[in-house]
Every structure is written in C-alpha cells, then in structure tokens.
C-alpha cells in the first residue's frame, strides 16, 4: 500500500444539527463501523437528509471514503453537497471524462469497423487527476464517483513512483527536469500553456499540473540547483506564493518507465506472434494482416512517444498482470482501511454487476476479427466479486434496498423521519372501471389548489391516449417520453413547477431530478400489472414522488391487490405511522418543501448577477448563429463547473452537443 504523508482529519461545516431520527442513524452507523461491521444498509426515506447523515458518519469515522452513484448527474449533486460540508478537506469527483464516447466495435453482419471516437471533457479529466493525486498525498479524502471507478486505470505504484518531487535547494539541472517531465507525459509548449504542459524561458521552467486548472508553478534555477518554486496564475503569471515542496504526478494515468516499456513491448510482440499463428492456422489471413499492421504501428508509437491511442488495451502487459487478473482501478489508489458508500444502491449495484458482461461481448468481437490482441479483454471493468474483494467496509444507501444488499447484511439502519415533518403520502386503491372520470375529478381538485399531478402509465400508447383525452377535457397536460433529451426534460419539469401546465404523464417517473414539491397527487395506472415498474421497489419509489408536499396522496388504479402493491402500501403506512408519532410528540406541523425554481440556463454568482441564455429555436438559426450560441453556452458551462454546479453544467453540455449535431 502507498504511504500517505498527511494525517488530516475531516471537519464537517454545517449550520444544521442532526434532527428527526438522524442522530440515532448516525450513532448506529458509526458504532457498527467502529465495531468492525463489514456491510450495513442505511434505509433512508426520500427527503430525510441521507447525504447529511453520510457526511456526519464520514467526519466521525475519519476514513478515506469512496461514494459511488449510478450516473454523472447524481454524482455531481453529491459532489456539490459534500464540497459544502467539507470545505477544508479534499472532496474529489471521478466520473468518465467522455462528453461523447463511441467505443471501438466491429459488426460482422455488415463488415463494419467502428473506430473509437470520443470527446474528452478537460474539466473532468482535471478532476480525475486531482482525485488520484489527493489519494496518494493525504487521508482526508472523499471521492464521489460513478461506476467509472471500477474501470481499468494505470497502476497506482507506477503513478506514484513516476511522480517528480521538487524542493528549493535540490540539486537537479534544468535539462534533467525537462527529461523527467517528458517521461511522465508532460508536453513542452512555450506558447499554449495548458494542463499537462510546461514551458521554458532561460533558467525558468513553468509547469502546469494535470490536476489544476488555473494555478501553475514556476521553478527557478541557479546553475544546477533549484533556487525557488513559486505558485503562479497560469494566465497572468501573477505570483501567488512560495512552495517548499512540489510533487508533479504524471499527466496520464497510464504511465510506465523505459525499462518496463521495453519489457511490455516484448510481451506484446510475443502475444502478437502467437495470435498470428492462430489466425494463419485457421485460414484467417485478412484478420492476421489487420492485427499485424495495427499492433506494429502501436508498438512503434509506444517506442517513440511512450504512448499510443488505445494504450489501455495493452494495460495487462504494461502493468505486468497475468491473463484474467483484474485491472488496477481507482479502488487501488485507496489505502486498505477505507469506507465505501453506495448511493441509490438498488440501482448502482445492478450497474456494477452488469458492466463486465457488456464490455466483454464487444471486445471479444474485436479480438475474433483481428482488431485487437486477446489481452485487450483484460482492459475491462471489475466483475462484481472482484469489486467485493476491495471492500473493507461498506454502507448501502437506499429508500428501497435491492435483493443483493439484503443478502449481504442483516444490519439495517432506518432513517424515516424528515426534518420538515413531512409524512409519507396516503395511498388509496381504486378500481379501473371509470378511472378516467375519477382521475379527471382528482386532477381538477389539485389544479384549483395550485398543485400539480404526476400520472404514470405502463405503455407509450396509453400515455399518448390519456394525454389526448385530458387535453380535450381542458387540462393543461404534457407527456414525457423516453425520446425527450436531457435539456428538454429539465425544461418540462421547470414548466410544471411554474404552472405552465398542471399534469405530467410518463412511463418511468422515477429518474433523478424529478422531485417536484408542488406535486400533491401521484396516480399509478395498471398498478396490478407486476413488472419492473410495478414491483415493490418501483411502487415505493413512485409513491415517494408525492412525499414532498404536505397534501401528498397516491391513487393506485387496479382490479386486484398484488403482493407488490400490498407490500408497498404496508411499508408506506409503517413509515407514515412512525413519522406521525414523532411529529405529535415534538409538536411539528408538516410543511411542504420550499424549493427555488431556477432558470434553466442561469448561474447565480456571489454578486447575484446572472448569466442567461434566452430560450431560442435553434433549428431556425444559421450555422454562424449556432456557432455563436455554442460559444456562449460553453462559457456558461465552464462558469457552472467553477461554481461546482455540475448538474447545470451537464445540462448545458447536452445542449451544446445537440447544437453541434445540427451542423
């Protein structure tokens, strides 16, 4: 394991004190961790402040912590919240750095080879480097990650051993430093100074670390000795301070030294020779020629540049791993005694399980048709059992824990009471006969009170028919289907909150970002049709959409009571009873959550100024107008990222991608 040089402790900063059943949940979780419990579940109802509880636990157990979410948006939200709770500690963000990613693939039926195509988000790449360097330098680290954290990354030992350590007074010549920087994949560019680059002016070398975005370092030499190291603003060169010690980690996570490189190339060549014999014996001459040409080109690039596109496909040889051995991942950068928290574990653990099979199916096709060596199969995500082998202690966090989590542990810590006093909604079951008229009456009641309604159906046709019917009846209604893009989806939710329309119909309204405090009625059609969206967990998640309004109510339309319905109704009633008893004992009156309705493209700064993009019809713009709009949006995206509002930055990014696709 890598020795951390820093023993900092976590310091939680919050104007809140634990309330409701947060204190007992925090105490139980901490006691279980300190008592050596390997796995436990935090069963937290929607809106009970699970992130705050997680933060309290982290600050008390004081271990490096990995928090895994099931998508970038949720990871971004959690990252922002943890940054606020721990301003003095290292809170890092580690997700896939691809804005756009088309993996390398081959389709035999049409003889189509699809080359890997991607667009790397520079900001996220910086944050990934920041995460790995923090993990090697200190202990007070929280990394919020997507399942990207189980994908192959370079060896942490190579990454750490390759780091360049510099101090004032150190004997090293300027040229020695330049050679070391090139070895760890820094690029010399005296004119365009960006992350992962350095520039030289006489006896002064300026280096821009891969983990920074505004600050660089100026290393001043006196002969063959470092005279001083200064931190500077990368753009202006303004001096920000003196540094007593500077550690420069490699500019890429896949790095190896010259000695290892030659050994790796020898292994690649041996595997190539072996695979060529296999193809030739099978009469696959085209595949053999293809593989020979591609691999020899990559070897030449590795020899000359120390890097090649797709270098990760040779990671087994670079890392010195055996066939089938799991790759290094972000988890290997953590010390042995670290804590894992899985947010929305009922979704995330399913993702962790499924990543390996999909990756192998695609790569096997590339190997079979001579596009990659068989060792490329070992550049892969971890299998679930390999992930489990990294687990020292883990907390699964969910309102509806999955079967997997429940099999792993009997230790369940409940957090049912909301700080706002809000109760789980009342759930009714009504017959399907006459359901349209009944539903219309319920909608009108809510509309008169200025409240909103969610309706969830099972089929696209039913959603469309219901939308048409309600429109004929004078209801302001919209249907949100799967073809709607991220940005438009956010606009729809905002319009619902503003009252542009009163009813939203969808098939799956469980997705993140769909919590709307104005919604007081959730109607579930075909509630008795068992399946993914009508199982116990799906129903509890849907019921939770009405839990942010003091008038919250759920109506299930069904002709029979299924086991899933009964379990969901019983669990909701159980939670509601606990919440009512607590409110009565403490004299709390439930209050609907007050949540600001934010403009779609607005970033509020400390000065309360706003950057806004008017709502325009981009389809009628000229190409030059679209290019101008893209520039404006990219500026706003970077401003959002600087303010750590990654949810908004992601929305703007999606809008930019939509605009680019029009050209």
Swiss-Prot record:
Domain text from the record? The beta-hairpin motif is involved in DNA binding.
Q: Which domain of life is it from?
A: Bacteria
Per the database record, which ranges form the Helicase C-terminal domain? 435-601
Query: Its function?
Result: The UvrABC repair system catalyzes the recognition and processing of DNA lesions. A damage recognition complex composed of 2 UvrA and 2 UvrB subunits scans DNA for abnormalities. Upon binding of the UvrA(2)B(2) complex to a putative damaged site, the DNA wraps around one UvrB monomer. DNA wrap is dependent on ATP binding by UvrB and probably causes local melting of the DNA helix, facilitating insertion of UvrB beta-hairpin between the DNA strands. Then UvrB probes one DNA strand for the presence of a lesion.
| Keywords assigned | ATP-binding, Cytoplasm, DNA damage, DNA excision, DNA repair, Excision nuclease, Helicase, Hydrolase, Nucleotide-binding, SOS response
Q: Where in the cell is it found?
A: Cytoplasm
**What's the source species for this entry?**
Streptococcus uberis (strain ATCC BAA-854 / 0140J)
- Kindly provide the name given to this protein in its UniProt entry: UvrABC system protein B
UVR domain spans which residues? 627-662
A Gene Ontology BP annotation from the UniProt entry? SOS response
Family stated for the protein in its record? Belongs to the UvrB family.
Renumbered to this chain, motif Beta-hairpin spans 97-120
Quaternary data: Forms a heterotetramer with UvrA during the search for lesions. Interacts with UvrC in an incision complex.
**UniProt-listed Pfam families:** Helicase_C (PF00271), ResIII (PF04851), UVR (PF02151), UvrB (PF12344), UvrB_inter (PF17757)
Q: Which HAMAP family match?
A: UvrB
InterPro entries membership: Helicase/UvrB_N, Helicase_ATP-bd, Helicase_C-like, P-loop_NTPase, UVR_dom, UVR_dom_sf, UvrB, UvrB_inter
